[in-house]
Regions:
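Residue-level detector of conserved catalytic or cofactor/ligand-binding positions
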Residues: 208-217
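A glycine-rich (often HGG/GG-containing) alpha/beta subdomain
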Residues: 1-148, 152, 156
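Long, non-coiled-coil amphipathic alpha-helical linker/lever segments
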Residues: 126-209
């Protein structure tokens, strides 16, 4: 069960790579990271400016070094989730990633549920529902066509296209209603029939795009 308002953590990259990125998001994200991350030099991590990137070490409760990492700080609302957020880039060992997650949980984090970072981004207005769905589509894309569609959707292109199509339909509907009001005057024609045909064609194109993306859901 997702607990909105808590501070969550999870590995945000696929396993098996040279680098793993652990994302922490929530009201205590910066403070929790500060408890286990010691910058190599300079001020404490929690006092650094937004978007700052810091090199240092992850230290456990006994003072032992777990890994040398690079950590990035994002302050709300300018982050992926719209919350305070940090990202720890560590070596790609599953053991190291799990050790860091365990330390974060000891420091007050909860493990994120699948899709929870994107859910928070949606709830905080960082993306609309279409864009949130596109994140899953992008991850699952298996062809160039589905990848292009997901990227366009994630950038808001699909949402804008649907919104524009809705506006055109509403405008045409109002003109057709106006024609009904003046039905006694057969010579009056407000709605452009060719525009109606074009809208129908555009709707078919949108439906075909949705059909392409369905297998990735």
């Amino acid at each position: 069960m997702m607990n909105i308002g808590s501070t969550i953590c999870a590995v945000a990259t696929a396993q098996g790579g040279a680098i793993s990125v652990i994302r922490i998001s929530g009201p205590q994200a910066i403070q929790v990271t500060d408890r286990i991350f010691k910058p190599a030099k300079g001020m404490p991590f929690s006092e650094r400016a937004p978007y700052s990137v810091s090199y240092g070490r992850i230290i456990d409760s006994e003072g032992s070094v777990v890994d040398e990492v690079v950590t990035t700080l994002y302050r709300a609302p300018k982050s992926y989730t719209g919350e305070d957020c940090t990202e720890i880039a560590c070596h790609g060992s599953t053991y190291i990633a799990n050790r860091i997650l365990a330390l974060l949980i000891e420091a007050g984090c909860s493990m994120a549920q699948p899709g929870e970072f994107t859910q928070r981004a949606f709830l905080n207005g960082k993306m609309d529902l279409s864009q949130a769905e596109a994140v899953a589509d992008l991850i699952a894309s298996t062809s160039a066509a589905t990848h292009r569609l997901a990227m366009n959707q994630m950038r808001g292109g699909f949402s804008r296209e649907l919104s524009a199509l809705r506006d055109r339909l509403l405008h045409l509907t109002s003109l057709m209603e106006l024609e009904l009001d003046f039905s006694d005057h057969e010579e009056l024609e407000f709605a452009d029939r060719s525009e109606l045909q074009q809208i129908a064609t555009d709707i078919e194109q949108v439906l075909s795009l949705i059909h392409i993306s369905e297998p990735t859901r």
